[in-house]
């Protein structure tokens, strides 16, 4: 077994309030550094995974410099996913020690429009200019970076323009991702239909033909494979939330639209658990997930929506049962008619 990536939600604190944010927790917290070091040290037996630092806004972690040093002192590579607002702080940390910059594979920047108007409508005033300022800094320091766009009804018309902008400013990669529905996005008609998801995926394939850099569709895209195995299910990606808990995947632990739904996606509290024990529990959960999915397929309840693997997973864990309150929502039919829930 070889784990290729470990994702850490360093904090759920953020300086922005994006319209499409799926993080519903009102309490803020930061990943404990001692637990971070324990995980990094114990993970070496599984190879030398790449470390991904996310949030919230990971640059707001008060001990970011210590965290980066733990990573590089253990000879891991890493990248940071950021909204671009605090990059001067990151650059100062990187410039203080050569290995911090050497082991950094790149910066992933969230972009939600090709224009200031569209981007700032989703992320707030001043966000686009801060993002472009960070791009200028990255280029001046010859640092690799990628753009990540979460596609929704507000920016749907700018998919191609985002690719042109990304290519023009020298990004190394561009990732398109489907948006996770929330009660806020449902109420404001930001969510796309399953048919529009497929149109987005087809458009991304077209865009790949004219850009100078690599263009990718993130996890969650349609697949004809009912037993599709994502990076979680192949055990190539580990994810920890800001509470130092091993979670089933990165899209689940902060997605709390309905607090009454049990947190069945939480595998282990790493404050109290060694990594080996946590991974053993993770393996058991993956086995149960696949077993339940096979039973679900055999039951004849499979729908067209289930071909989107992240949708199926959110449905399995009861994360989108709230859609029953939005009967006209394009993704609500499955929840109203059969309401798959995780087995207790």
Q: What spans do the regions from the language model cover?
A:
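Short cysteine clusters
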Residues: 14, 18-21, 230, 249-250, ...
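Radical SAM enzyme [4Fe-4S]-AdoMet core and its adjacent flexible, acidic
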Residues: 9, 103-112, 117-273
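Residues that line or immediately flank small-molecule/substrate-binding pockets and catalytic motifs
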Residues: 25, 55, 111, 178, ...
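Flexible mid-to-C-terminal extensions adjoining Fe-S/redox cofactors in radical SAM and related proteins
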Residues: 1-2, 245, 251-344
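Small disulfide-bonded, cysteine-rich extracellular recognition modules and tandem repeats
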Residues: 24, 122, 233, 313-316
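Processing junctions and N-termini across compartments
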Residues: 8, 12-15, 224, 303-307
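A generic secondary-structure micro-motif detector
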Residues: 29, 54-57, 124, 151-152, ...
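Conserved alpha-helical substructure of the radical SAM core
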Residues: 1-106, 320-324, 330-344
